[in-house]
Amino acid sequence: MKLKDFFTPDTVKLHLEGESKDEILKELIAVLRLDEKSQAILYKTVKRRENLGSTGIGKGIAIPHCRSLVVNRLRLAYGRKPEGIDFKAIDGQPVYHFFLIVAPPLEVSNQYLPVLGKIAQFAKDPDVPRKLQEIDAEEAFLELLEAKAV
């Protein structure tokens, strides 16, 4: 299982426009291309998870994640906010890179936690935040995942 396999150019958005945590979450959810009702349900679920504690893990990266009935398989999206926003990250720094993970409540493949772990491992690489900022096309994001062999 490689992270690259969970993304397509359509699930990568390099110029998030939101100016707040809520706007960014809604924009990331929209990348998954769910119907309007499902997006609203998913937003409430992600927001509830975020209220338990920020998913901003530091170094400019956040991994909002949850389980929800609105998906029938693991779904991921990546978004970048070049200017960064206050996401209440654990290091107190702005967040520029967002990895959204949504899994169904009962996931037969059990990929949710391993994928979450792989993204956290990817984020720990000291070069990753800089390389993510330098990406100029969605395909380059996929190439970076491949190059880092996660």
Predicted features along the sequence, with ranges:
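Cytosolic covalent-transfer regions centered on His/Cys nucleophiles
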Residues: 1-150
